[in-house]
Regions:
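Conserved C-terminal structural/oligomerization subdomain of aldehyde/semialdehyde dehydrogenase
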Residues: 1-105
Length: 105
């Protein structure tokens, strides 16, 4: 089920969209690129579709915010949900000074 609302401007659309404890996805419809950018930046959701309905592709992350969950599945961000990143500091060996951090995935 989806709800459709006609609003006066981008500000009203953002207020209406954010007035919920959920934030999985939004679909906005406009012919104005600047308005689309304001909506994308302003709506608190895991994904925004402009002039399109919800779509999914295994190459891009999928997930929500607020009570719609946290973290992502699919894409490189989804893969990282299943790994632990370990930080390792390695000092120069054989009498050398200094050290540098390395992230190992």
């Amino acid at each position: 089920m989806a709800s459709l609302f006609r609003v006066r401007d981008a500000g009203e659309a953002i207020r209406l969209a954010n007035d919920t404890k959920f934030g999985l996805g939004a679909s906005v419809w406009t012919t104005d690129r600047d308005e689309a950018a304001r909506l994308i930046d302003g709506i608190e959701t895991g994904q925004v579709f402009v002039n399109a309905m919800v779509a999914s592709d295994p190459r891009v992350p999928f997930g929500g915010v607020k009570h719609s969950g946290f973290g992502r599945e699919l894409g490189v961000y989804g893969i990282r949900e299943f790994v632990n990143i370990k930080t390792v500091w390695i000092a120069k060996m054989n009498g050398g000074g200094g050290s540098h951090p390395t992230a190992i995935e």
